[in-house]
């Protein structure tokens, strides 16, 4: 039986498992090492920068359940550098070790419409948006947003991938096909002035806190620079922190959560 409320202290037995071997996995491993933890990386074979800085590596696919079981038995907990881990993989790992954050959180982060619904439930505002299942939905929703929107696949996609800007000259049928004719969300395009990020952590013993709020600067939809702490008045800071804690409660969340606000 896994006791998910016990703190995981740095020692030879308490190895942190990391899912994904990219740059974020590397940063997790480096941070863990500074705190005295050993790390065990699980990722498909390939060009994985995180492999250079961990104590142990298992190369396997996300559906290689034999390797996943062996990996889970070697670690005190497992976390991930990205959200798109298959649910069956997470369910298997959760049966043998403490997966942080939980499968519920991963599922919410994997589906944009669920993310938006959770944000609204927690008190955050979102741009107007519509769930798009076919071209009829797309035509109707685009008209509602005055042909000024962004169409995104409901799952996957990042750094500007898996999305298209919609305007008066857009060929909606062509764009729909380019995105694979899969379920999408259509978001109102906002003319925003600033982007602020808030990062909140909460441990299984309910110790929590915030990193300094930061301001992000992008070029062509890709992050170029972050400045911390961001210059914000205390009223806005307190409001953001309150809503972030509410989001954490709604997700029964443990770990570190980051939210981008515009």
Task: Give, region by region, the residue ranges found by the protein language model.
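CheY-like receiver
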Residues: 70-71, 118, 141-144, 175-178
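Short glycine-rich anion-binding loops that position phosphate/pyrophosphate groups of nucleotides
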Residues: 83-85, 155-156, 201
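Short, hinge-like loop/turn segments at secondary-structure boundaries
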Residues: 56-60, 117-120, 145-147, 167-169, ...
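ATP-binding N-terminal substructure of ATP-dependent carboxylate-amine bond-forming enzymes
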Residues: 1-110, 136
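A conserved helix-loop-beta module that forms one wall/lid of the active-site cleft
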Residues: 96, 102-164
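Structural detector of well-ordered beta-strand residues that form the stable sheet scaffold
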Residues: 40, 79, 99-101, 127, ...
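Internal nucleotide-binding/catalytic subdomain
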Residues: 162, 166-262
């Amino acid at each position: 039986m896994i006791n998910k409320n016990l703190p995981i202290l740095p020692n030879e037995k308490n190895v942190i498992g990391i899912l994904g071997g990219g740059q974020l996995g590397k940063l997790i491993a480096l941070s863990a090492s500074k705190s005295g933890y050993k790390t065990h990386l699980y990722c498909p074979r390939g060009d994985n920068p995180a492999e250079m800085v961990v104590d142990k590596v298992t190369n396997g696919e996300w559906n290689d359940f034999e390797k996943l079981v062996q990996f889970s038995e070697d670690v005190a907990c497992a976390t991930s550098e990205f959200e798109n881990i298959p649910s069956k993989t997470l369910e298997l790992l959760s049966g043998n070790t403490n997966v942080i954050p939980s499968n519920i959180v991963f599922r919410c982060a994997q589906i944009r419409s669920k993310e938006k619904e959770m944000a609204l439930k927690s008190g955050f505002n979102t741009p107007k948006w519509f769930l798009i299942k076919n071209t009829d939905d797309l035509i109707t929703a685009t008209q509602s947003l005055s042909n000024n929107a962004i169409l995104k696949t409901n799952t996957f996609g990042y750094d500007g991938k898996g999305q298209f800007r919609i305007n008066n000259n857009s060929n909606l049928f062509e764009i729909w096909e380019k995105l694979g004719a899969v379920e999408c969300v259509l978001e109102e395009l906002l003319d925003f002035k600033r982007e602020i990020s808030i990062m909140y952590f909460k441990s299984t013993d309910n110790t929590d806190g915030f990193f300094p709020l930061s301001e992000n600067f992008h070029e062509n939809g890709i992050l170029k620079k972050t400045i911390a702490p961001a210059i914000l008045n205390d009223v806005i800071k307190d409001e953001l922190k309150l809503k972030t804690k509410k989001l954490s409660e709604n997700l029964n969340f443990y770990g570190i959560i980051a939210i981008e606000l515009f």
